[in-house]
């Protein structure tokens, strides 16, 4: 077992905060419409250029163990914000650093860290409630485009394409992003279906950066029962291997020996495979599997019809242009089912909706109808070089996630203005415990930092702009860093999803609280590199090489 390095008190926190600063300084330059790019060296291929805060954060690992612990904690705030709201990662990073720095100063001055945390939590909850109250629902295509534009760092085309995609498939519809093979940026609507079941093992993942399994032109096996033994499937598996195409297995469950065997074959590269549970329960599960069978021109292997796995041929398998599987969802794009069969199935479901008297059944049937007939919108992102395409695709994915968040919880004034103005509500929040009151003061000051950083990235003095905005009572009055003018942010279309702002603050406060309440830190002690043995010849420095 490796020996451990143990640090206590302010010494541990100060060293962690050095790591926090290193990561925050790399991420903060991307904030706002005039934020800068960050170039990241990759282990292979061209360097990556990005303005995405979480991509920058994820790329950072520090050599010093204690500093790295601080950096990794800060990284978790950005990552959580990206997972929950899809955006706000840089804001979360800037807020977390400000909260942790100020909190640590007070702990060093003798304040109780647990009471500071309670005060911070009280302040954060008050701000979150205010954000929810002041959020405005968005309905028009223009408003959706505005959110997409701001989240993609002012790229109007991205905002407009996302709005168009949402118009095509509905706000709740499935929208995916992929790289185009030309210069253009287009929206294409294809036949497709998404259901809420993810991969049964993370070993099926093919894209480790996004933690998704991507299968191009796969066969799709639909089996009504549980799969616990692959012996009956061997003939069909051999046929799939010979075809050199991937396989998606959708069954009631895949467990035990069957799952282990699939994972081993996937890791050895013999069979490109992924397995997911079938969506729904009971009779509804069977109906949804039949929908998938029609969509992919496959057959549902069910013992009710006397079908057995050992007798299944490759003709019984469905096919699709592409399948993407995340931890929680599976998206089947462009199944090869014929139009007439799909239309007949849609009419059948519509007649069932008309006949049913149960609201619950009606809702579930309408969900099936939307999945079968709604289609999938694909945003095809092009560019002049591979580096440009990847950078733009990252921004499109961020903007899409932010737009979904805006549809879900509404929008507030953007550009850090909402956080700044809600900080003034906290000045009226008083508690008897002086340490908790100090925790509230920490949050008041930290809420000014995102706007300061946006302004400073645009080349102006952040403190001066913050002071000028706080003189105004209008909560929507802010600074447009793109045009360098003071405007009504809502009227100017500078809006942020309420969910993004809320999540950024909550995740930042969570991480900062962990840092200021840490009293002991235990990490692996760095190994001391042994000196290389000297050789008799003049090439002594080569002694450590082993061929």
From Swiss-Prot:
Catalytic activity: ATP + H2O + a folded polypeptide = ADP + phosphate + an unfolded polypeptide
GO molecular function, one term: ATP binding
Segments for region (Disordered): 528-547
Superkingdom per UniProt: Bacteria
Pfam families xref list: Cpn60_TCP1 (PF00118)
Disulfide-bonded cysteines: none
SUPFAM superfamilies in alphabetical order: GroEL apical domain-like (SSF52029), GroEL equatorial domain-like (SSF48592), GroEL-intermediate domain like (SSF54849)
EC number: 5.6.1.7
CDD domains membership: GroEL (cd03344)
Compartment annotation: Cytoplasm
UniProt xrefs under InterPro entries: Chaperonin_Cpn60_CS, Cpn60/GroEL, Cpn60/GroEL/TCP-1, GroEL-like_apical_dom_sf, GROEL-like_equatorial_sf, TCP-1-like_intermed_sf
Group of enzyme by EC: isomerase
Amino acid composition bias (Gly residues), ranges on this chain: 537-547
Keywords for the protein's UniProt record, in alphabetical order: ATP-binding, Chaperone, Cytoplasm, Isomerase, Nucleotide-binding
Any GO BP: protein refolding
Keyword Nucleotidyltransferase: no
Binding site for ATP: 30-33, 51, 87-91, 415, 496
Gene Ontology CC: one annotated term: cytoplasm
Subunit structure: Forms a cylinder of 14 subunits composed of two heptameric rings stacked back-to-back. Interacts with the co-chaperonin GroES.
PANTHER family: 60 KDA HEAT SHOCK PROTEIN, MITOCHONDRIAL (PTHR45633)
Primary role: Together with its co-chaperonin GroES, plays an essential role in assisting protein folding. The GroEL-GroES system forms a nano-cage that allows encapsulation of the non-native substrate proteins and provides a physical environment optimized to promote and accelerate protein folding.
Family affiliation: Belongs to the chaperonin (HSP60) family.
Listed name of the protein: Chaperonin GroEL
UniProt organism field: Rickettsia canadensis (strain McKiel)
């Amino acid at each position: 077992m490796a020996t451990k390095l143990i640090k206590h008190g302010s010494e541990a926190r100060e060293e962690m905060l050095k790591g926090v600063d290193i990561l925050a300084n790399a991420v903060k330059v991307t904030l706002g419409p005039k934020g800068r790019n960050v170039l990241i060296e990759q282990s292979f291929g061209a360097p990556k250029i990005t303005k995405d805060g979480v991509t920058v954060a994820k790329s950072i690992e520090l050599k010093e163990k204690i500093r790295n612990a601080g950096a990794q904690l800060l990284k978790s705030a950005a990552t959580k914000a990206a997972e929950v709201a899809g955006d706000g990662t840089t804001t979360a990073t800037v807020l977390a650093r400000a909260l942790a720095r100020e909190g640590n100063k007070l702990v060093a001055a003798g304040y109780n860290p647990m009471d500071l945390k309670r005060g911070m939590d009280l302040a954060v909850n008050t701000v979150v409630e205010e954000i929810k109250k002041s959020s405005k629902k968005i309905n028009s295509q223009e408003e959706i485009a505005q959110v997409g534009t701001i989240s993609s760092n002012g790229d109007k085309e991205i905002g407009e394409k996302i709005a168009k995609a949402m118009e095509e498939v509905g706000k709740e519809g499935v929208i995916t992003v992929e790289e185009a093979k030309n210069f253009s940026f287009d929206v294409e609507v294809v036949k497709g279906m998404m259901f809420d079941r993810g991969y049964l093992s993370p070993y099926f993942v093919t894209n480790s950066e996004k933690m998704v399994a991507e299968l191009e032109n796969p066969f799709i096996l639909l089996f009504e029962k549980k799969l616990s033994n692959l012996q009956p499937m061997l003939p069909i598996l051999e046929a799939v291997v010979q075809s050199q195409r991937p396989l998606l297995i959708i069954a009631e469950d895949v467990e035990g020996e069957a799952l282990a065997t699939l994972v081993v074959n996937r890791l050895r590269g013999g069979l490109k495979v992924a397995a997911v549970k079938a969506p729904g329960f009971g009779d509804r599960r069977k109906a949804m599997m039949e929908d998938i069978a029609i969509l992919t021109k496959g057959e549902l292997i069910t013992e009710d019809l006397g079908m057995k796995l050992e007798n299944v041929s490759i003709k019984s398998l469905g096919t699709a242009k592409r399948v993407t599987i995340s931890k929680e969802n599976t998206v089947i794009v462009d199944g090869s089912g014929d139009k007439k069969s799909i239309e007949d199935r849609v009419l059948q479901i519509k007649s069932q909706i008309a006949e049913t008297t149960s609201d619950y059944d009606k809702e579930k049937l309408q969900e099936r109808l939307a999945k079968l007939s709604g289609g999938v919108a694909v945003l095809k992102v092009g560019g002049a070089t591979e580096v440009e395409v990847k950078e733009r695709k990252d921004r499109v994915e961020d903007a899409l996630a932010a737009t979904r968040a805006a549809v879900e919880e509404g929008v507030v004034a953007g550009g850090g203005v909402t956080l700044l103005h809600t900080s003034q509500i906290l000045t009226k929040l008083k508690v008897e415990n002086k340490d908790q009151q100090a925790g509230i003061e920490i949050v008041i000051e930290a809420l000014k930092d995102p706007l300061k950083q946006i302004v400073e990235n645009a080349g102006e003095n952040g403190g001066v702009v913050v002071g000028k905005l706080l003189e105004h009572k209008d909560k929507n009055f802010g600074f447009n860093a793109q045009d360098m003018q003071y405007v009504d942010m809502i009227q100017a279309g500078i809006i942020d999803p309420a969910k993004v702002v809320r999540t950024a603050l909550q995740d930042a406060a969570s991480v900062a609280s962990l840092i200021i309440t840490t009293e002991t830190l235990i990490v692996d002690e760095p190994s001391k590199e042994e000196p290389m043995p000297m050789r008799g010849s003049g090439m002594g420095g080569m002694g450590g090489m082993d061929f």
